[in-house]
Amino acid sequence: MQLNERKLKILQAIIQDYIYTAEPVGSRSLSKKYDLQVSPATIRNEMADLEDMGYLIQPYTSAGRIPSDKGYRLYVDHLLQLEKNMVIQRDQIRSDLLNRFGEIEQLLQYSSKILSQLTNYTTIALAPQIKEVRLKHIQLIPMDEHHLLGIIITDTGLIKKTVLQVPEGLDAEAISKISEVINGRLQGVAIKGIPGEFTEEFTHELEQLSHGFDSVIPKMFQTLEELDKIELFLHGTTNIFNFPEFNDIFKAKSFLSMLEEKELISQLILSSSHKGMNATIGSENIYKEAKEYSLVTATYKIDEDVIGFVSIIGPTRMDYSNVMSTMGQVNKYINEVLKGKYK
C-alpha cells in the first residue's frame, strides 16, 4: 500500500482539522469542511488505509481518527506549509536586542519570552555548557582591601561574576599585573582545559606577584565549576491551560513536574537539537515523561560555536505551521543581531 496524492491530501486535512479542533475527525465532517472532491465513503476507506499504515489512530471512545506520531512526522517533514509572509515585531526585537542585552543569558531569556508570547506555548531556553566555550578575558576589580570582583568573559559572550577573598596588602598595581599574567596565559583556552594550565610554574609566577594569592586560585576553580551548572529559563508555563489536553489536572501536574527536572529537560533539548531548527514528536523523545509532547528546538550559534538553545514545548497536537514559522522569523532577527554584536 502506497501513499498516493489523495491519501496525502486527506491526511493533511485530518491533521489540520485536529490541530484546530482537538476533536477526532470523521469522514463526513471532513468532506463538508474541505474540498477533497471525493465522497465520504471514499474518505472513510482512505482513512482506514491510513490507519493500517500507522498514520492515524482511532480513540476507543470515538468513531473518528486522530494523527499518530508517525502521521505528525510526515506532516512536518513533507506537508507543512510555513507562513513565509508572517509579520512580527522585527524592529522591536532588533531594538531590544541591540539596546538592552549584553549577555548571552539575557538574549536566550528574551528569545524564550518573545516566542512564548507570540505562540502561546511554553518555551525553554538552555544556556550553553561553560566547559565547551573558551575564555576571552578575566578581569579583577578591587572592592575593598579584602575582596576582588572577578569577571569571567567567554568568547561567546557569557559573563560570570564572583567575589574573591584576597590576601591583605594586595594593591591595585599587583592586581593589574596578576590580571595581565592570567589573561596572557589563559586567553583562548577552553574552560574545561583551564585547570591543566595551572602548573607549578604558573602558580609560582602568580605567588611571586602576591604572597598568598594561591588561596584565591581554588575559589576561581570553584567558580568555573559552578558556571557549568544547567541553566534553564522557562516562560509561559501556564499557557498549557489553553489546551484541552491539560483539562485533566493530573496530566497538567505531570507536565509541570517534568519542567522542574532540569537534567531531563536539558537532555531532551540537547537530543532534539540539530543545525537550525528541528522538531521531535511524541515517541521520538528520549524520555517516557515526554512521549505525549512535541519540542521544536532552535540552536543559536556564533560562527560554529553553539551559544544556546530555545525550545517550544506543547502537546503533539501542536500548531506546527505557526510555531515553526514564528520561530524561524525570530531566529532570523536574532542571528542578524548576533552577527553584528559578537564579531
Curated annotation (Swiss-Prot):
Protein name: Heat-inducible transcription repressor HrcA
The protein's role, per its UniProt record: Negative regulator of class I heat shock genes (grpE-dnaK-dnaJ and groELS operons). Prevents heat-shock induction of these operons.
PANTHER family: HEAT-INDUCIBLE TRANSCRIPTION REPRESSOR HRCA
Source species taxonomy: Bacteria, Bacillati, Bacillota, Clostridia, Peptostreptococcales
GO biological process terms held by the UniProt record: negative regulation of DNA-templated transcription
Family label: Belongs to the HrcA family.
Keywords, in A-Z order: Repressor, Stress response, Transcription, Transcription regulation
GO molecular function, one term: DNA binding
Gene: hrcA
UniProt-listed Pfam families: HrcA
